[in-house]
Swiss-Prot record:
Family per record: Belongs to the FtsA/MreB family.
Protein name, per record: Cell division protein FtsA
Species name: Staphylococcus epidermidis (strain ATCC 35984 / DSM 28319 / BCRC 17069 / CCUG 31568 / BM 3577 / RP62A)
PANTHER family: CELL DIVISION PROTEIN FTSA (PTHR32432:SF4), CELL DIVISION PROTEIN FTSA-RELATED (PTHR32432)
Region of interest: Disordered: 392-464
Annotated gene: ftsA
């Protein structure tokens, strides 16, 4: 069977992560990962281009080796920095009865990008909230419906500062891969929430190394998002200062003995640390350590509450979902639960090989990619083994000894319907295999042009 892969890159402040995954029934099967720690990123942005580029290149190589996939194309996640979230509508008209397909959906969504009037920003994600066919038929997915007059979309829009977008893409593509599309964490976090949480109103709190990102969802859709420049590094700084030790020692102690909820911390777990101004070793307990950690984590949560108030959000009926690298700390859930009356949970990805909160953003980027590919008819995946089914898209590739990235294939699939309509009927004397090879080549060329043109159009607009 021809494998179809998605590759995501998460450029975080402490490390760069790459995941190679494939759609599997209702979830994602992770087949390879890479992670490289780096000092080239600060507050989620490129701080040292060369160091960051090398880290990205290394993690792509690790993921490629682990998965056996020749990685050529990637989906890039972007942090919630310099980000605007707002609603917009657009409508396209039809002058005859038209069966709606992915190209019409893409057209009505792309029209929203052109309406962006926020200076020095670029629209990176447009996600449909509802579609309206012929003025009064409200639907969630209009594909295959007949429209006589119009297709309208009410959508959420995420825009980011152009300079952030340009530099992120430039750094990734300097590693020899192409960025197929970008997805903001503001949108990605929707995939880690349950339908009930998204409907009632839930707040995602991603505590990373330099940034704590906050996204609020209600009635199934993203409402707003913001970031706070206070996170795991501040916790480590407090420990280093409180224990009078080095940052590196404080980081090790945090991971080995850290506890964010003082009441649950142990006074039996004892450890010793070197002092920065002497040769002596001083002993501390987990409870001593927790005193510093709890105060800083509490401050982070208070900052989150302030953000929610500034956004005009006073109720979080769906609860709080905490993720990110610092969610690994013991006691984080208990501390937040002690501060709020709503439900609190820690989110950890369920896939084998990435069962750590710090991988939430990277795997969510793949979820976002799959969702848009299916919405726009770029891919259609089912699980029938019979070749007679049009939607069976994972096909045998017995001649290939190495795995391809899969992106060439799904770019072909994006134009399959269009090619089927316009391609002339093959002569009867032409073999079935010849026809298949000819059609595949044609689809690959046209599909690739379509996918690339979408992103090239975006990149061109950045430099205008």
């Amino acid at each position: 069977m021809e494998e179809h892969y998605y590759v995501s890159i998460d450029i975080g402040s402490s490390s760069v992560k790459t995941i190679v995954g494939e759609k599997f029934h209702n979830g994602i099967n992770v087949i390879g990962t890479g992670q490289t720690y780096t000092s080239g990123i600060k507050n989620g942005l490129i701080d040292d281009f060369d160091i960051a580029r090398q880290a990205i290149k290394d993690t792509i190589k690790k993921a490629s080796i682990a998965s056996g996939v020749d990685i050529k194309d990637v989906f890039l996640k972007l942090p919630i920095i310099g980000t605007e979230v707002y609603d917009e509508s657009n409508e396209i008209e039809f002058y005859e009865d038209t069966e709606i397909d992915g190209t019409h959906i893409e057209s009505v969504l792309e029209g929203i990008r052109d309406k962006n009037d926020v200076p020095e920003t670029e629209v990176i994600n447009v996600f449909p909230i509802r579609f309206v066919v012929d003025k009064d038929n409200e639907v969630s997915d209009p594909k295959e419906l007949i429209a006589r007059h119009s297709l309208k979309v009410d959508a959420g829009v995420i825009a980011i500062q152009k300079s952030i977008l340009i530099n992120m893409i430039k750094c990734v593509e300097a590693c020899g891969v192409d960025v197929l599309d970008v997805y903001s964490d503001a949108y990605n976090y929707g995939s880690i929430l349950t339908p009930t949480e998204k409907e009632l109103g839930a707040c995602v709190i991603d505590i990373g190394e330099d940034l704590t990102q906050v996204a609020f969802y209600e009635r199934g859709e993203l409402v707003d998002a913001e970031s706070i420049e206070m996170a795991g590094r501040d916790i480590t700084d407090d420990i280093a200062q409180g224990l009078n030790t080095t940052y590196d020692t404080a980081e090790k102690v945090k991971h080995q003995y850290g506890h964010a909820f003082y009441d649950s911390a142990s006074d039996q777990d004892v450890f010793s640390v070197d002092q920065v101004d002497s040769d002596e070793h001083v002993q501390y307990t987990q409870k001593d350590l927790s005193d510093f950690i709890e105060q800083r984590v509490e401050d982070i949560f208070f900052e989150v509450f302030d953000v929610l108030q500034e956004l005009g959000l006073t109720k979080v009926n769906g609860g709080f979902v905490v993720t990110g690298g610092s969610a690994n700390l013991l006691g984080v859930k208990e501390l937040l639960q002690d501060m709020v009356s709503e439900k609190v949970r820690i989110h950890t990805p369920s896939q084998m090989g990435i069962r750590k909160p710090e991988f939430s953003s990277a795997i969510s980027t793949i979820s976002s990619s799959i969702a848009f590919d299916e919405l726009l008819d770029y891919v259609t995946i089912s699980y029938q083994d019979n070749e007679e089914f049009e939607e069976e898209v994972i096909e045998s590739d017995k001649d290939s000894e190495t795995k391809s990235s899969g992106f060439d294939w799904f770019k072909r699939k994006s134009n399959k319907k269009e090619n089927d309509e316009v391609a002339p009927e093959a002569p009867r004397e032409e073999s079935y295999e010849d026809r298949e090879n000819h059609l595949e080549d044609e689809q690959q060329t046209e599909g690739k042009a379509k996918e690339e043109s979408k992103f090239k159009k975006l990149m061109k607009s950045l430099f205008e």
